[in-house]
């Protein structure tokens, strides 16, 4: 990849776009204090959305969610493409028949299709996978339309969601309705009986959200996923919520 003009070999801004949610930046850094590893980062406004340095929980989101399914030939939805770690983890599972990945930000989809991010070519080359530009939360609230633009009202075996920082720390206030009982019921209607809803959260397990989740789904739990943070030289943790339809 070419470096942006005027920038050092240790830092490159690969793309900058204005979006309805704020300025979106894709950048690459080389961390010399970590053996020169290349790190890809996405920033939206003042929020750091994702980093390739930390992706263990994104992978766990797919692995834990799909592991709770029985049988095979699963149709899966991923809400939030990001740098592609959840999507790739899902596609590594041979029992996944199809994958629909929904992202509100067209530039993020463009990065993958243009090969600007490390996993882009692998994900877009997989015939099972389709990247859809859309509002996950609007589609979750409209079962008659559903997540698949080619098959209205289609149901799925698993929905894996990684968009907001947590059920209470939202990228946009309009997402709040999704995490209430009525919003979760609309989501559940798009999941097959026995299917799974899995949700990433950067916060510790929230008993209040678990209680709401339990009004709609069964077998609800919050798994803490720990990973090493080499920048802080200590372990960090996030949460994966799991629930069965």
Region spans (language model):
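Short strand-turn motif at the edge of the Rossmann-like AdoMet-binding core
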Residues: 163-164, 200-204
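Glycine-/small-residue-rich active-site loops that bind phosphorylated ligands and cofactors
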Residues: 49, 198, 205
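Short, basic/glycine-rich phosphate-binding loops at helix/coil junctions
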Residues: 37-45, 162-167
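The AdoMet/dcAdoMet-binding core of the Class I SAM-like
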Residues: 55-190, 220-221, 225-226, 234-236, ...
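N-terminal auxiliary segments of SAM/dcSAM-dependent transferases
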Residues: 1-37
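Class I S-adenosyl-L-methionine
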Residues: 18, 203-245
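Class I SAM-dependent methyltransferase Rossmann-like catalytic core
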Residues: 22, 28-29, 42-73
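Short glycine-dipeptide loop
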Residues: 191-197
């Amino acid at each position: 990849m070419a470096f942006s003009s005027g920038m050092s070999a240790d830092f490159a801004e690969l793309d900058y776009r204005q979006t309805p949610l704020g300025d979106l930046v894709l950048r690459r850094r080389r961390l010399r204090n970590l053996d020169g590893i290349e790190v890809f980062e996405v920033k939206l406004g003042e929020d750091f959305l994702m980093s390739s340095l930390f992706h263990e929980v994104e992978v766990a989101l797919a692995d834990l969610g799909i592991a709770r399914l029985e049988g095979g030939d699963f149709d899966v939805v991923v809400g939030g493409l990001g740098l592609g770690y959840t999507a790739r983890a899902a596609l590594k599972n041979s029992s996944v028949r199809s994958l629909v990945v929904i992202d509100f930000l067209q530039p993020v989809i463009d990065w993958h299709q243009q090969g600007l991010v490390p996993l882009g070519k692998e994900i877009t080359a997989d015939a099972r996978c389709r990247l859809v530009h859309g509002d996950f939360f609007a589609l979750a609230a409209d079962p008659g339309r559903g997540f698949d633009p080619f098959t209205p009202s289609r149901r799925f075996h698993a929905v894996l969601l990684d968009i907001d920082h947590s059920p209470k720390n939202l990228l946009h206030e309009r997402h709040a309705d999704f995490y209430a009982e009525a919003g979760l019921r609309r989501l559940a209607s798009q999941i097959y009986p026995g299917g799974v809803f899995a949700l990433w959260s950067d916060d510790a397990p929230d008993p209040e959200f678990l209680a709401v989740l339990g009004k709609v789904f069964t077998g609800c739990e919050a798994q803490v996923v720990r990973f090493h943070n080499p920048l802080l030289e200590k372990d960090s943790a996030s949460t994966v919520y799991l629930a069965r339809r």
